[in-house]
Swiss-Prot record:
Residues 649-810 form the Helicase C-terminal domain. Keywords: ATP-binding, DNA damage, DNA repair, DNA-binding, Helicase, Hydrolase, Nucleotide-binding, Nucleus, Phosphoprotein. It comes from Homo sapiens (Human). Residues 1-14 have a biased composition (Polar residues). This is DNA repair and recombination protein RAD54B. Interacts with RAD51 through the NH2-terminal domain. Immunoprecipitation experiments show that the interaction is constitutive and not induced by ionizing radiation. The interaction may be indirect. A motif (DEGH box) lies at residues 431-434. GO terms for molecular function: ATP binding; DNA binding; DNA helicase activity; DNA translocase activity; hydrolase activity; RNA helicase activity. It holds the Pfam family SNF2-rel_dom.
Amino acid sequence: MRRSAAPSQLQGNSFKKPKFIPPGRSNPGLNEEITKLNPDIKLFEGVAINNTFLPSQNDLRICSLNLPSEESTREINNRDNCSGKYCFEAPTLATLDPPHTVHSAPKEVAVSKEQEEKSDSLVKYFSVVWCKPSKKKHKKWEGDAVLIVKGKSFILKNLEGKDIGRGIGYKFKELEKIEEGQTLMICGKEIEVMGVISPDDFSSGRCFQLGGGSTAISHSSQVARKCFSNPFKSVCKPSSKENRQNDFQNCKPRHDPYTPNSLVMPRPDKNHQWVFNKNCFPLVDVVIDPYLVYHLRPHQKEGIIFLYECVMGMRMNGRCGAILADEMGLGKTLQCISLIWTLQCQGPYGGKPVIKKTLIVTPGSLVNNWKKEFQKWLGSERIKIFTVDQDHKVEEFIKSIFYSVLIISYEMLLRSLDQIKNIKFDLLICDEGHRLKNSAIKTTTALISLSCEKRIILTGTPIQNDLQEFFALIDFVNPGILGSLSSYRKIYEEPIILSREPSASEEEKELGERRAAELTCLTGLFILRRTQEIINKYLPPKIENVVFCRPGALQIELYRKLLNSQVVRFCLQGLLENSPHLICIGALKKLCNHPCLLFNSIKEKECSSTCDKNEEKSLYKGLLSVFPADYNPLLFTEKESGKLQVLSKLLAVIHELRPTEKVVLVSNYTQTLNILQEVCKRHGYAYTRLDGQTPISQRQQIVDGFNSQHSSFFIFLLSSKAGGVGLNLIGGSHLILYDIDWNPATDIQAMSRVWRDGQKYPVHIYRLLTTGTIEEKIYQRQISKQGLCGAVVDLTKTSEHIQFSVEELKNLFTLHESSDCVTHDLLDCECTGEEVHTGDSLEKFIVSRDCQLGPHHQKSNSLKPLSMSQLKQWKHFSGDHLNLTDPFLERITENVSFIFQNITTQATGT
């Protein structure tokens, strides 16, 4: 009987039928037929098992490291640049199969107990095709699947990892004899065994990748089309062959690849040439502009090569997407500008440019910053940049033939989507692309609708603790590389999350680790992340301080009153729904910043006749009686807030000791910025401000004015929500983070605004926390669960929304009045804070790569995300025994209960 082709075997050439071979050529003899029909004799004894369904994990073609040759990269040495190829070999279709033995029911075979125990521990995996039961000779198979045989039971999974059949009751000899070509009836489905899957391929998940996650090149979109040739051309003109020969002779690199320190891109291999060079153009070296190379640092040169290989489809079988996840301050913008300028002028095939038009989508506050960077590195004549704002519409870009780069904000993109869809962009760059972590939002949907295959995501923010967010980013740059979302969850997310559970078995842990490793291998080829350690030697020292401030008397009294409210008590008993705990948390955070913020909220709720939030009104009940009778929030005092009191003294000390240095003052809330602005006015500090109300067209001008050496501003008031991402504020050398956010990435981004390339002064960072309050609890959650240093993805699953157990809420809604620092108490540190404490030894955790989902071969000595154990290695100072050498901190000790300090020096980077 001729075996019908499986769906997976017909992909790409479904109309081609297997060659027919007469049955007589390979018809088994009569003795073989009798042997196969005898149940007491081993089935298919002479047939070898074909194990070529998927390559094993040891196959060097999987995630192989193809470093560029010396010819193609003459300037870059000693770099770790992997170029992986996924070679999946389809099993050879047999032209004539041996007779099939259809098992419709288990057979009665005597089995010893020893054999049964042995069979229970035996697990086998098979690739199969399945269909509904049919008596037709040539069956129509409905899909591919994976058959898992363990002992006397089996599980049938489709290529999305979903169970489509289970069974038990077969004798172990029945299941032990399963071989290629055998037909079985399982759960109302008829299956045919196509081959054996190795345990490595199953545990890594590679056996599921033949389906939706195929990395094959789409020929309809990738293959170069031949240009139209006019059949009525003049016979007097030179032939196309002669023209092509002339073109070949004139094909030379734009820049000399043999000059010292030249940066030459890798040449495409033969497979790439076969797909993308149908016209047989000569290979030409692609050389980065020497002017740009002169200013590039080694890690930036590596990043340009990485991006070039990704968008050219050299790293992954024609896939043209990339994620550049370098930490803040490593020059992602310059790397992209170099790539755009290179691809717009050069190409590996005949020197023809690879791209014509580029779309850059960025947060509104960075639109003008991108334009400024283009002008800085390329001038205003070499490349024409068009930025979209209220005065400059997309229609102007469409009408003009001079502009080649369109820079637009995410908000303006949604408004102008219809016009942008009509433009053919060859390259799409999404700055701060971590906002695309949800594939269902309008922004992501709009960008996906653009017909542009070359896509780059830039993000300095770690992708936060959600594998589905990670999938959304991966699927955006390289659609379908991980299959559908449902298959991704079954094959990768669920096993990985299950392996992290405390109750996970050893088998589940091993499976989760293997799936995580395979996910790392798949995605590491187009994800590049470097930490800030690689530029530490170029930066001045950084002194980071976590300052715990004692709350004021009014704050303590109000805090107690809030914790004793009926709403908080019901929260702790789990009696209320609709997340009232979030209202309580918000009220406590306002109180930590300043009591006047809480006073304003109480007054607003009392005056609001349409307010339906009874819980919030109940929470504020009786709080007004705690305030003085004549309390006026506009006439607030600094002593009412412990943090504001410390801030006021700190600003005065900096202004006195370093009058030429500037301060960046950051808050998450506009109302808090209003208070800080009033403090600046009272003390006569010159300030500028950037928040959500600042027009986008003015933001870059404000930043440039602050960074200018001739600026008279002393303080830059910054909203972390509006301007905490991407801004370069190297004009300031002191950064004060007034409040804390649940998302550690928000704080990290804000703190990275000043310690960047170009900073001339030592950087001082101060994080102000109210001792014993909810702010300290949030800080503990940051460093113990998520860390202060990013990874591309945290494989421990936590909820995207703020959800707490009753025990966690009890911890949050507790005021520790007797402790100078609850965080220090949790460290079990033996120091008393009377002198500098640096721990027994500074532990450095060696990790195999800079990000959890990155190439295994990239070694790094970078520290892991800051944990409670690492915080123990910081310097500890008690407020009662402050022996500080820091000239700023030693003069603000009056209301400080504890200080953690860490110094990153230029020499050691620690």
